[in-house]
Amino acid sequence: MPARKLLSGFLTAVLFTALPAAAKDIVWKQQTITITKNPSRIAVYDPAALDILESLGVQTAAYNDGGQLDPAKLAAEPPELIILGGATAGRLKDTAAIAPTLDLTPDTDSYLTDLAARTMLLADIFGKNKAAEQKLKAVSNKRAILKQRTEGKTAVFLLMENGGFIPQSEDDRFGFFYTLSGLYTPDNADLTHHSEDPPPAPLPEKASSRQKKAAREAEEKRLAEQNARLEKLLAARPDYIAVLNPHADASATRAELQKHPVLGRYSAQTILLDTGSWYRIGAGLDNTARMLDELIRATD
């Protein structure tokens, strides 16, 4: 089952193997746990880790647990290993009291090195080293192809929030875009973050003409300030503009960008990034390959 179909909430995956059990020590960063070798039951609450497991061919029977990590449910039928990451990492103390728990939160500051390390860790647990090496080699080959296309070129990454666009530098949350793509931010690009206020709430039905005028002027000012910042940013003349909208599908976002007074003029060089891959799953194994394929197509 593809990982992207399982992401309406946190996920639990039950993994089955028929290999004999034996104790195995696992060391990961500052964590050391002892698990059953080739565990037959594992609870996964991290989309990137689930993607890696499925990439390696570890058979999973997965279900959505309603978006909540429920320690009581886990304690009722304890797994042999629990994997957390990202939003669920803060529950480590809760789950460690139930079963051995690993926090596999991706380190996107060292994206490719960390991806390889997490992949090989899981491959070692489940005896999938050969598959892991082949998959990692494929990722490396795709990145080499992409870097040939992007050599010497620049981009800005825009995250859509509250009706505005927040630029992302190499040091921001989505800075791994630059690592994967080989693109750089233009030297003179103003990547300063500005708080993007949400659009104002609808006026009451019986709003006065003065209230309506004030609301209209406030909205016009808000949009004008956003557009002025975009104009200043794009004056750096990036080769590409990557846009990620966490809250809408590609068709809706494309329509919004086409009618935008600033970005509408740059449609030929805009890369519209897949929300599931870039925002929901992130640093998985097959998912990284998908992200690279997306960028290869966009820079062709």
Features from the language model and the residues they span:
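Proline-aspartate-enriched helix->loop->beta-strand connector
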Residues: 71-87, 100, 230-233, 237-242
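Short helix-initiation/N-cap motifs at beta->coil->alpha
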Residues: 28, 65-72, 192-196, 210-230
